[in-house]
Structures are given as C-alpha cells and as structure tokens.
C-alpha cells in the first residue's frame, strides 16, 4: 500500500511539474515561432514580397530562444544561419545581412554585406549560450565571430577612437563615417569589454555616440561624423529618431541599474519619456535637431519603451496598449520589439551589471507589472 501511495505521489509531483512548465512557457515566443520561423530555423519577414530573412532577425530569435531556454529552436536558428548566411561557417565569415527570393526559382543571399547589429547580438547569444548551457561549440563559434567583427567592422576614427561600423562595406569614406546608434547595446558593449581591445574602448566611444548625437534628447536613426568637423547635426530630413532609434531607448531601459552609464543615458533621453507621457503614445518620428515630433508610433514602440519609462503610470498606459493591440502574424519588427520590451517587463530575462544574461528559467512565471 505504501509503495502504491509513493507511486501516486511521484506521479502527482511529475504532473504538477509538467503543468507548471507548460504554464510558465513564454506564449508570445511560442506564437512567434509558429508565425515567423520555418521548420528549418529561418526567421521570415512576411512584410516583404521576397519573404526575406535578415541576420538581425536570426540573431534576435537566437536571443529569445536562449532567454526561453529553447535549445532546439536555438540550434535550428544557428544551423540555418551558418549554412545559408555564412557560407557554412560563422567562424570564417560574417553572415550576409539579407536572404530571400531572388527570382521565382531561386532563394539565396540577396546582399552579401554584413550588418553589425545582427553580428553583435549573434556573437553575444552564442557566447552566453555556451556559458549557460555549457556548450563548448557555441562558445568557440561566438569567440571566433567576435574576433571577426573586430577585424572587419571596427575602425579607428580620428577624434573618436575605435567605432563599430554598421557593416563591413559602404559606411566609411576618406573623411566621413556613418553610424547607427542602435547597433551596439551598452550592456553588450560592457560584456565584450572582457575580451580586451578594441572592445575595452568601444564601450566608451559608443557612449559618446549615444550622448553626443542627441542634442534634444532624441537619438537619430543614422548620423555622420566628419573628421575635424565632428558630428553632423545640422537640420536635414534624414536626421530623425524613428524605427531604428526606438531600440536605443529599449537597450538603455534594459541595462542593469548598477551600470553607471544607465543613469546618464536615461537623463539624456528623458525628453522621449516626457513626450510619450504627454501624448499617451510614443511618436513615430522626431526631428533630432528641433525636437519636433510627428505621427503615432506603432505598438512595438510602446513595448520597446516599457523598460525605458521610469514612471509606473506611464508604463501602465503603454502596457495596456500592447495588450490591446498585440502584433499579429504580419508585423515582424513590431513583434520582435514586443518580445524584447514585454519579455523584460514580465521578468523573463534581465542583464547583469557585466552584461550577462540572467534568465528566468527556474523562477515562477509572473505577469507584467
């Protein structure tokens, strides 16, 4: 009788554990996999007629898989990326940034140039997957990829120092360089500083990029730096804060409170928080020079600002907007912004002061709060 009782108790404990695991899965991530990721591990953006895949999309999905402790999905994403974007080896090649339907009968790389934002997230995710899952292969590939990024996408800019170019081709001229402030999240820059040069100095030059190019508190999507003249912040149509720059506020908000850079960044970008609180929604576009805003940002912008907003009432307004207008199966970019922002808001992951991932694998699931 006691043996049977122990057996029933064991089964009950197992069923409880299984149910708890099911209840604590990440529903938004599971839905993203169904809507956007092929069985082979390709993240598809259905908004483009060519059904494109980007290195950015692959790298973001690798991060989400790691945060969700989804090892099978991570492996599929990694293998597809390596085989199709990196000529079979992420140790030897930076991934091409764009892949899709070239013509009715051909699916292939559409642009072989690299995109350093995807490369950065991919290297970090591989290194952290190696650490958290104790997978030596991921550590080795992540280390090799990071070295390749340093060789092919990092440049010494007179007057600035080591800077991360947006890609290996097309962003550096004789006396002019083009940068994207959203491409190197500060917490990832902090993480990479353990690898020495050039990463140990990139963290500080990246901070300069973020602080010095936002005169009114709004980060630009893109900005030029010219030798002897500095940042080109004269009013022009292209100097706006919009779909790229929304990630600057997202990354800053997700930084560990103990990182001294966080307070400086939140203070510099406070006008974005103030404007969002005033209007009830984030702006779609802001003129970086004048601070004039226009349009209503999509729901992904609201999700991206959940970690960034420091006022609880302001957070609640954006949280409700995300809940009421959750991205569907045809909104890739809004969906990834939501996985980042809402995922952080739901405590599914955090970053340590060293820039390491602190996942929520072993803790009880919580709702947004």
From Swiss-Prot:
This chain's function reads: Hydrolyzes carboxymethylcellulose.
Example of a GO cellular component annotation carried by this entry? extracellular region
Reaction catalysed by this enzyme: Endohydrolysis of (1->4)-beta-D-glucosidic linkages in cellulose, lichenin and cereal beta-D-glucans
Instruction: For this UniProt record, give its keywords in alphabetical order, as a comma-separated list.
Output: Carbohydrate metabolism, Cellulose degradation, Glycosidase, Hydrolase, Polysaccharide degradation, Secreted, Signal
Which compartment or compartments is the protein found in?
Secreted
> What's the EC number here?
3.2.1.4
Q: Which GO terms describe its molecular function?
A: cellulase activity
Q: What is the lineage of its organism?
A: Bacteria, Pseudomonadati, Pseudomonadota, Gammaproteobacteria, Enterobacterales
The pathway is:
Glycan metabolism; bacterial cellulose biosynthesis
Q: Which GO BP terms apply?
A: cellulose catabolic process
Signal found in the keyword field: yes
Identify the InterPro entries for this entry.
6-hairpin_glycosidase_sf, 6hp_glycosidase-like_sf, Glyco_hydro_8, Glyco_hydro_8_CS
Family membership noted in the UniProt record: Belongs to the glycosyl hydrolase 8 (cellulase D) family.
Q: Does the keyword Acyltransferase apply?
A: no
Protein name (Swiss-Prot/TrEMBL):
Endoglucanase
Which residues are annotated as active site?
Answer: 56 (proton donor), 117 (nucleophile)
Major location category of this protein: secreted
Name the PROSITE patterns for this protein: GLYCOSYL_HYDROL_F8
What start and end residues bound the annotated signal peptide? 1-22
Question: Record's Gene3D superfamilies?
Answer: 1.50.10.10
Organism from which the protein derives: Salmonella typhimurium (strain LT2 / SGSC1412 / ATCC 700720)
């Amino acid at each position: 009788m006691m043996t049977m009782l122990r057996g029933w108790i064991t089964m009950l404990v197992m069923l409880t554990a299984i149910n708890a695991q099911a209840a604590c899965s990440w529903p938004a991530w599971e839905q993203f996999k169904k809507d956007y990721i092929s069985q082979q591990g390709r993240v598809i953006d259905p908004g483009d007629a060519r059904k494109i895949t980007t290195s950015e999309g692959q790298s973001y999905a690798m991060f989400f898989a790691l945060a969700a402790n989804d090892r099978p999905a991570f492996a599929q994403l990694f293998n597809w990326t390596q085989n199709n974007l990196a000529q079979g080896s992420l140790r030897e090649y930076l991934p091409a940034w764009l892949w899709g339907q070239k013509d009715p009968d051909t699916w292939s790389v559409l642009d072989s140039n690299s995109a350093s934002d995807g490369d950065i997230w991919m290297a970090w995710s591989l290194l952290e997957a190696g650490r958290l899952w104790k997978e030596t292969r991921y550590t080795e590939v992540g280390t090799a990829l990071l070295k390749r990024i340093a060789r092919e996408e990092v440049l010494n800019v007179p007057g600035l120092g080591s800077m991360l170019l947006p890609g290996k081709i097309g962003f550096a001229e004789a006396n002019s360089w083009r940068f994207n402030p959203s491409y190197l999240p500060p917490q990832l820059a902090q993480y990479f500083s353990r690898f020495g040069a050039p990463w140990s100095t990139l963290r500080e030059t990246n901070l300069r990029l973020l602080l010095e190019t936002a005169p009114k508190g709004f980060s630009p999507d893109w900005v030029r730096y010219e030798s002897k003249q500095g940042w080109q912040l004269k009013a022009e149509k292209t100097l706006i804060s919009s779909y790229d720059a929304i990630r600057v506020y997202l990354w800053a908000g997700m930084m560990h409170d103990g990182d001294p850079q966080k307070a400086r960044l939140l203070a510099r970008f406070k006008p974005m928080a103030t404007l969002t609180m005033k209007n009830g929604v984030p702006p779609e576009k802001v003129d970086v020079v004048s601070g004039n805003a226009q349009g209503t940002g999509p729901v992904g912008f609201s999700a991206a600002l959940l970690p960034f907003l420091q006022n609880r009432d302001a957070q609640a307004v954006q949280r409700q907007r995300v809940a009421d207008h959750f991205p569907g199966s045809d909104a890739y970019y809004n969906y990834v912004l939501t996985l980042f922002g809402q995922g952080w808001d739901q405590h599914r992951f955090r970053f340590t002061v060293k820039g390491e991932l602190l996942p929520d694998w072993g803790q009880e699931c919580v709702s947004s709060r």
